[in-house]
Amino acid sequence: MEEIDLCWRIQNSKFKIRFNHNSEVFHANAASLKQTNPKKTYLNFRNQLFMVTKNSKNNLFFLLIEKFIIDAIVSIYLLFDKGFNHFIAIIKAYVSFYKHINLLIEFRKKNKRHLKHYQTRSIIFKYLFHKR
């Protein structure tokens, strides 16, 4: 997720993202925390909220409402699939987000978002309702 945030901030600063197809990337996915660790769930949800708030050009209010609804559905799923600790981790992520929201809004105001956003649609709804 950090690499997405970095690319988003680079583009918002009017730089361009390039790639080299000859490069080789070694990525230790979840090297520090295992997928079963609720702390990983907490960090993933919190960092998503921070990233969207800092970088999105869209109307933040409606975007966060949509994200909250999706996250609420996911949290209920995780409650039954992975247990109570993952459910609580998502609640803690939102508490942390609301504690930091003033700083995130300040960051938004200071840093202009210059991206020409394309129309985005939820891949979750696309998967659930269109089976793609």
Residue ranges and their predicted role:
Residues 1-5, 40:
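Acidic donor-binding loop at a coil-to-helix junction in glycosyltransferase catalytic cores
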Residues 91-132:
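Membrane-interface aromatic/basic loop that binds lipid-linked glycans or pyrophosphate carriers
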Residues 12-105:
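Active-site-adjacent helix/loop segment of glycosyltransferases
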